[in-house]
């Protein structure tokens, strides 16, 4: 993932806003995300784990997808998931949905991290097969279902442009530059 300042993005055509942005810093950020949703089926000791990926841009979209998964799979016992939002990849959450602590959400999120994805949701719907899998078995099953769903997705590298215009006294410039550097801007 390469981030950095640019001189003139295509999004700001010569006559379309560029003149206004002439003295501003424009930053282009690249990130990987889901273009086309993916699905997987993983079976272990009679249980079925259905993996799904979706492109999302807000927590509300995540909630809506999870509600739809629950409605579409009323006989399932768990709908576990993880998501990450934003080019900075700092906004994320995961849920074990009643499975033993850290046996579902973290393994799913680990696959999102490993793939370097953001603005995506990975959900795994579990149908219980009558045999307990134990902590290690659950971790492996949720991890594998998530991994296979991600592999079946179409992943693209996307770019966003951010325009920053900062006004300050010349004497404050070193502090401003340090802050920008700390924010990786």
Cite the ranges covered by each PLM segment.
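C-terminal regulatory domains involved in ligand/effector binding and gene-expression control
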Residues: 7, 12, 18, 22-103
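Stable alpha-helical structural segments in soluble proteins, enriched in small hydrophobic residues
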Residues: 141, 145-153
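Conserved structured catalytic cores and adjacent interaction surfaces
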Residues: 137-139
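Short amphipathic alpha-helix segments
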Residues: 167-185
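Positively charged, aromatic-enriched nucleic acid-contacting surfaces
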Residues: 100-117
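Short glycine-/aliphatic-rich beta-strand segments at the starts of folded cytosolic domains
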Residues: 155-170
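Glycine- and acidic-rich phosphate- and metal-coordinating loops
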Residues: 118-128
């Amino acid at each position: 993932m390469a981030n950095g300042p640019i001189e003139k993005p295509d999004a700001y055509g010569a006559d379309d806003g560029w003149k206004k942005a002439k003295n501003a810093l424009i930053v282009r950020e690249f990130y990987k995300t889901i273009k086309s949703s993916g699905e997987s089926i993983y079976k272990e000791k009679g249980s079925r784990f259905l993996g799904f990926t979706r492109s999302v841009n807000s927590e509300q979209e995540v909630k809506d997808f999870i509600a739809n998964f629950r409605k579409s799979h009323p006989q399932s016992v768990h709908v576990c998931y993880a998501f990450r939002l934003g080019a900075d990849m700092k906004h994320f959450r995961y849920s074990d949905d009643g499975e033993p602590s850290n046996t579902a959400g973290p393994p799913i999120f680990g696959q999102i991290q490993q793939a370097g994805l953001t603005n995506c949701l990975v959900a795994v719907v579990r149908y219980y097969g009558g045999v307990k899998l134990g902590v290690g078995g659950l971790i492996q099953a949720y991890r594998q279902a998530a991994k296979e769903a991600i592999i079946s997705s179409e992943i693209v590298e996307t770019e966003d442009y951010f325009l920053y215009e900062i006004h300050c006294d010349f004497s404050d410039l070193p502090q401003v530059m340090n802050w920008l550097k700390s924010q990786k801007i």
